[in-house]
Swiss-Prot record:
Entry comment, domain topic: The SAM domain mediates the association with the 3'-UTR of specific mRNAs.
Biased composition (Low complexity): 321-338
Domain of life: Eukaryota
Protein name listed in UniProt: Protein Smaug
Listed SMART domains: SAM
GO cellular component: cytoplasm; P-body
Length: 999
């Protein structure tokens, strides 16, 4: 028979060797569904022929070099697939149909939907079938019924069986007899078989109801998922067949009611089941030492199996492997092709599966072949032996070998959903560049021998041994009869089926599985969860309470390299991006341990920069940690500097009680500042502490004393008005409270600490923010003013370019006429009649008798003085009141004087850049001037002329008369109304028009 074996055909590969044992396979499988009737066969053949003629090349996946007609080839392929389909069980058929439906287009899917609806209607026509189907459908979605079923499954525990076996072991009649071909069955064994049969019946019922689970029924789905861990554990203890649990996994992985999160959890338990199957296969190899069967019998035992699996990595190879899912544990043989994306296997490429011998499951006709192995040896304290080393099969089972299949159905379902465990499950220290096995050469050779022997257990066609590596060399056959170095460990407690296992019997061998070197920031996590999911949380085995063996293992570990110059750059480059530097962040350094007071040891070591020695404390109790000495640390491999530092810090831990007691007393007596107390609390908050409720003397309760000091400090800050409420102290105290909330010692008081932190945060917000330094009053140029110092006259720029001492105004307008001051206001001359006039009366114009150095410069020198106009000059006041008026004006000007006067000098005449450079201004104080116009010269001033003095004397009588009329016996300043700004501007403009003539 010829047919295509392309990679796209999912059904046609790996079938050639099954013609000899097809009858035995079909009888062993016992398919529950009936074969198609003759009518259906005729319809199928007609449809096949029609499809063949309708399509010129119906076999798109066939080899184009074939010479047979396409219609005959397609018919043969359909016949082959149909024959295979009849040999499969319901679960295998469902998985295959599910895989094929995903490859169809939408029209074909709709056609199949209509066909399925029609078939369901026809099949439900009979009353008996309808009634049974309805009952199963109702029970499959009834949470109450499912819960009762789960409780019944959990009720059958092996403890009752163990008691029955122990009670019946003393009876002579119950002793088994192996002298003949038959064995006397004891009452305990009958109970055992009844127990196993009941659990198996429940699993069969679950297997029938699980496909009928409706999407959206979360309550029923949760019960199905709850059954999985219990069933996997029973499989590891060889209570239920492995095939039933695998079929349940297959349905769950492809069921539309299962979400992605549910599949992740199922993937974890699937890996546990995979590890058990591989350990069982390893146990089958080890039975050669205890049972010493003939190698030919072991190789020939596969002839009783249900079929063989092709090692081709195409989708068809895995599909053919699914045909023997109910009874085979057949590994891949011969070739080493790569796996496809559609049907990738779940087993790692470095691990081998062994063929399951038919009828070898606890003597009940099917199941795992590792009956003589202690089932609890495979899972020691939750840590499987396959997870104690790297992915290169650290137990030495098969260092070299072709990839194998755990089971075709589970592999197919897992690969279709993209949860193939090959990538994640192979995670080891190889990502860190440290995958170096410390096996002896003899051990490595033994592992190679085991792999060769395991590859010979699964034949290709009807039990024929594989041509390549099927028969081991003679020397290897002798080595197979010798126990491997770990065989005594695995088989040491075979007779103690359910007894307690010596957890530390593996320490010497586990130490041999360590790597030679590791980065200083890399920790070897041996937890099953962290090994499978590549978690970064440091998980500690709770049951490993004894730390002596752990320290012995730590002592044998070579000194790890740090990230320094001795660590070569190439090793860091080749280590990949996963350097695990994030493992030692404060949020990740946590211990899940039962040792009270040791959960915070990671943060404490991180604060000391000694977190590379975190493995030293993972199984240590609080009391053992306090008894560590420097000599002990050096004896277990800690460096001298680190051991000295760690010993000093441990000695300080013993002094915490005295320190807290002293701080408490000093705070109550007022001899210690709050900042000092907060600093002491900062040094203690990260140290490991026992909970407050832990038994022990009160003086050793560090957590209680710590809370007392915190209470005193916070009460002092809240109630004492004289306490220095520093913002920095409050911030540090809030940090201490935050660390205390997450501390193991204060878990029961977290709410109180949160309330206290909230009160301190409110106090911190209500505090006055810090101001700048305030100078005392009367000091400095600003007289204690805390505001920004204002711009004064001393800082104003002078026109030194043109030789002028006048300050440059900050002009916002180009018109200089608006820059006026109090000097532009007309006020009387301060001449006293009883005193002779000074030598220079023009300096006494503004009433400042102190000379030119006391005259303030409010007016720009570019603004001319028009007070010398004889027509606009007001008459002088009476001499008796002139001096009083001058004093008042001086006081007024001093109040408005923001710019102290500078000493005046008489610079040479120079031009200014105002009024189109037509005004020549002389330096010094402004005086009454007479404007004399000369052509070509602009405006000139005649200072000190006799004409100016004469005009001034002639105007004095007129000014006196006008002043007497306005004053009426009162001073002119008191009676004269104040002029507005607009009036002053208009007056200045009028004076400007009178005295200036522009060309």
């Amino acid at each position: 028979m010829k047919y295509a074996t392309g990679t796209d055909n999912a059904m046609t590969s790996g079938i050639s060797g099954q013609t000899n044992n097809s009858n035995s396979v079909s009888n062993e499988m016992q398919p529950t569904t009936s074969t198609p009737t003759a009518v259906h066969k005729e319809a199928t053949s007609t449809a096949t022929t029609t499809a063949t003629y309708a399509n010129g090349n119906p076999n798109s996946n066939a080899n184009p070099s074939q010479s047979q007609p396409s219609n005959a080839l397609f018919c043969e392929q359909v016949t082959t697939v149909t024959n295979l389909f009849e040999k499969w069980n319901d679960c295998e058929r469902t998985v295959v149909m599910y895989a094929l439906l995903k490859r169809l287009r939408y029209p074909s899917l709709k056609f199949l939907q209509y066909s399925i609806d029609s078939n369901l209607t026809q099949n439900l026509g009979t009353s008996q079938t309808n009634l049974s189907s309805v009952v199963i459908d109702i029970n499959a979605n009834n949470p109450v019924y499912l819960q009762n079923l789960l409780n019944a499954y959990k009720t059958f525990q092996p403890c009752d069986l163990l008691d029955a076996m122990s009670s019946s072991s003393s009876d002579k009649d119950s002793m088994p007899c192996y002298g003949s071909d038959f064995q006397i069955t004891t009452s305990a064994q009958c109970d055992e078989r009844k127990l196993y049969a009941r659990k198996e019946d429940i699993l069969h019922e679950v297997l029938n109801m699980l496909p009928l689970l409706k999407p959206g029924n979360d309550e029923a789905k949760l019960i199905y998922l709850t059954l999985i861990p219990v069933a996997v554990k029973d499989t590891m203890q060889q209570i239920v067949p492995t095939e039933l649990v695998q079929q349940i996994f297959s349905y769950l992985l492809i069921h539309p009611a299962i979400t992605s999160e549910d599949r992740r959890s199922l993937n974890i338990w699937l890996r546990h089941l995979e590890d058990h199957i591989q350990a069982a296969a390893a146990g089958l190899t080890n039975r050669s030492y205890f049972l010493q069967p003939s190698p030919q019998l072991v190789a020939g035992g596969s002839s009783t199996g249900s079929g063989s699996c092709s090692s081709s990595a195409t989708s068809s190879s895995t599909a053919s492997c699914s045909s023997v899912a109910s009874s085979s544990m057949c590994p891949a043989s011969g070739s080493r092709s790569s796996r496809t994306n559609d049907w990738q296997t779940i087993a790692p490429p470095s691990k081998q599966l062994q063929n399951k011998l038919a009828g070898d499951w606890r003597g009940s006709g099917g199941g795992s072949s590792s009956g003589s192995i202690n089932p609890l040896c495979d899972n020691l304290n939750g840590i499987t032996l396959n997870e104690l080393a790297s992915s290169q099969n650290s137990l030495g089972l098969s260092l070299e070998g072709s990839s194998s299949l755990v089971n075709g159905v589970v592999a197919g379902a897992g690969s279709m959903l993209g949860i193939g465990g090959g990538d994640d499950h192979d995670t080891s220290f190889s990502k860190n560049g440290t995958e170096i096995l410390d096996f002896d050469p003899v051990t490595a050779d033994m592992g190679e021998a085991c792999s060769l022997a395991s590859s010979s257990l699964c034949g290709r066609s009807g039990g024929n041994p594989v041509e390549d590596r099927s028969q081991p060399p003679p020397n290897l056959q002798q080595q197979l009869l010798q126990p491997p170095p770990y065989a005594s460990i695995l088989m040491g407690n075979v007779g103690d089926q359910f007894g307690e296992i010596n957890r530390w019997s593996l320490d010497s061998k586990i130490a041999a599985l360590k790597t030679r070197r590791s980065n200083s920031l890399t920790t070897q996590t041996i937890s099953s969860c962290s090994s499978s999911s590549n978690s970064s949380v440091i998980t500690v085995n709770d049951n490993c309470s004894n730390s002596t063996e752990n320290l012995a293992q730590f002592a044998n570990k070579p000194r790890s390299f740090s990230l320094s110059i001795e660590h070569q750059r190439g090793a860091l480059i080749n280590s990949g991006s996963d350097t695990r530097l994030d493992e030692f962040k404060p949020n990740y350094i946590k211990f899940h341990t039962r040792n009270v007071g040791m959960s915070g040891i990671g943060l404490w070591l991180k604060s000391l920069r000694l977190h590379k020695y975190i493995e030293l404390f993972k199984n240590m109790t609080y009391e053992e940690m306090l008894l560590i000495t420097e000599d002990f640390l050096q004896s277990v491999g800690v460096t001298k500097g680190a051991s000295h530092k760690l010993a000093l810090c441990i000695d300080k831990l013993k002094e915490r009680a005295n320190i807290l007691n002293r701080v408490e007393q000093d705070l109550l007596t007022g001899q210690m500042e709050l900042s000092t107390a907060v600093e002491e609390l900062t040094n203690i908050v990260l140290t490991p502490m026992k909970p407050l409720e832990s038994p022990g003397p009160p003086e050793e309760n560090i957590g209680l004393r710590f809370l007392k000091v915190i209470d005193i400090v916070t009460n002092t800050l809240q109630q004492d008005p004289y306490a220095a409420q520093d913002d920095e102290t409050l911030g540090v105290l809030m940090w201490i409270l935050d660390r205390s909330i997450h501390n193991e010692a204060f878990m029961n008081h977290a709410s109180q600490l949160k309330d206290l932190k909230f009160k301190l945060s409110k106090m911190k917000i209500s505090m006055v923010p810090k101001m700048h330094h305030v100078k005392p009053a009367g000091v400095g140029p600003n007289n204690g003013n805390i505001n920004k110092p204002r711009w004064n006259g001393k800082t104003r720029k002078c026109d030194t370019k043109n030789g002028s001492n006048d300050r440059i105004n900050n002009r916002k307008n180009s018109n200089d006429m608006l820059n006026f001051s109090l000097n532009c206001l007309p006020h009387p001359l301060p001449h006293h009649s009883q005193q002779p006039p000074p030598p220079l009366p023009q300096f006494d114009y503004n009433g400042y008798g102190g000379g030119p150095s006391h005259q303030p410069q409010y007016k720009s020198s570019s603004y001319p003085s028009f007070m010398g106009n004889p027509q606009q000059q007001p008459p002088p006041p009476p001499p008796s009141k002139a001096h009083h008026h001058a004093q008042q004006m001086q006081q007024m000007l001093q109040q408005h004087n923001h710019f102290p006067a500078l000493p005046q000098q008489t610079p040479p005449q120079s031009h200014r850049r105002s009024l189109n450079n037509l005004i020549l201004v002389t330096g010094g104080p402004q005086q009454p001037q007479q404007m004399i116009f000369k052509p070509g010269q602009g405006v000139l001033t005649n200072n000190g002329s006799n004409d100016n003095l004469g005009l001034e004397r002639n105007q004095q009588p007129q000014q006196q008369q006008q002043q007497r009329k306005l004053s009426g016996g009162v001073s002119s300043v008191e009676q004269q109304p104040k002029k507005t700004m607009a009036a002053v501007v208009m007056e200045n403009l009028a004076k400007f028009d009178q005295h200036f003539t522009l060309f």
